[in-house]
């Protein structure tokens, strides 16, 4: 494995947000940077080091149905949720927002910019769900790469 250098400040910032999520409620961390500079590695290092409960979801250019099945399997496996059978990505986001009303969780969504390709309405759905639930949720949401013009904070 390649060595990981000079990212202590960034690691600490990410870890601090996740550690404080119980008190601060819903938090959004925006990760931006050129391709191949180590964004995914930074996130993995940050949350593996602290043993923070987190989900890593990769938005590949598949059908929404395929992603729903893939993400449901990850959620079932990582969170120990039984009988979770969502029909849409919106269902998954709604479930995770409800889940984080009881338990803190960091959710990393890689290749977030491709969400429009999977379902053009989903970005607005996520924004509406986030705005309605962030004050009651202990979710640390980390979408990346990210076009910051698209989401209100």
What are these language model-derived features?
Residues 1-153:
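Phosphate-binding site recognition
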């Amino acid at each position: 494995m390649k060595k990981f250098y000079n990212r202590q400040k960034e690691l600490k910032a990410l870890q601090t947000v996740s550690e404080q999520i119980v008190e601060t409620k819903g938090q959004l961390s925006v990760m931006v940077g050129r391709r191949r500079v180590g964004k995914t590695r930074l996130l993995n290092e940050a949350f593996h080091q602290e043993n923070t409960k987190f989900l890593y979801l990769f938005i590949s250019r598949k059908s929404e149905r395929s992603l729903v099945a893939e993400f449901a399997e990850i959620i079932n496996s990582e969170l120990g949720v039984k009988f979770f059978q969502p029909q849409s990505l919106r269902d998954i986001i709604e479930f995770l927002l409800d889940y984080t009303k009881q338990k803190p969780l960091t959710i990393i969504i890689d290749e977030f910019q491709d969400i429009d390709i999977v379902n053009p309405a989903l970005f607005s759905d996520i924004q509406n769900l986030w705005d309605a639930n962030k004050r009651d949720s202990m979710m640390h949401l980390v979408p990346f790469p990210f076009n910051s013009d698209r989401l209100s904070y």
